[in-house]
């Protein structure tokens, strides 16, 4: 039997006793050497199961990542409770580029799903070597994966089960697409079902793999706050989208920001600046814009303000700058949008539409 079989056997024997396994391996130098010195009940059954898994791995072209090996994700290895062994499927480049985990509620609002999509699309332009990580759950998770696929970015799925199944099955198409450029990474052997405790355990992988974690939408008792706490425990940068005080689905995000546990961001530029990542320089383009003739003086003022901002301006700031009622500014923006001169962005931001 090879070393990998013994590594699997240890995780079959003690699936939750990570420190115990690490102590044995560090004392005797290898999984096989430590196994030979072990005398406990269940040893033979664990080794038999490991041999079955070893055959399954070969048959299905599964990659493995042992915590003492060079190919193990170095960010995750820093975490005290990092898995002993990981199983991966797809094209996983675990130690290349930047890593962002995006988490949030399963009952996600269209607004926050749109914010996630725009953030990921913009990150593709600013930091194209980034990977998007999440758990394939309903709501924010799958929105993050889909945005990454749309942008052509690698995305990693971290499930709470083995690689012989997909949960939820409704998202199988997303998982299949993710294999083309990213992949699926888990600590669970085949046959492992998605149980409640497994979801909590996998959250530490979602947090530990990343340079930064974004909580896009969460209530005060949302499961995403568990991932947020783990991210802080691992000294990862933590970010959150802000919400209105009346938004029940954003109370968790607002609490993280209020308690100074997470940094407030509204878009990709905020994230890139906070992380001090060097954005890719975009080629200079000559923007062609002709001021429409059949517009009011108030609409012209709005266009002049928008021309001065590359990133766009929030509608509330336009109200302040023009010193006009919100309803009037919003009506003018709608008219200009219909005319094709401005573009409405997520979060109440407006930009100029220009031709290059």
Stretches with model-predicted labels:
Residues 1-4, 66-356:
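Glycine-biased, small-residue-rich flexible motifs in mid-sequence functional cores and linkers
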Residues 1-71, 256, 339-341, 346-348, ...:
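Short, small/acidic-rich helices and loops at N termini and domain boundaries
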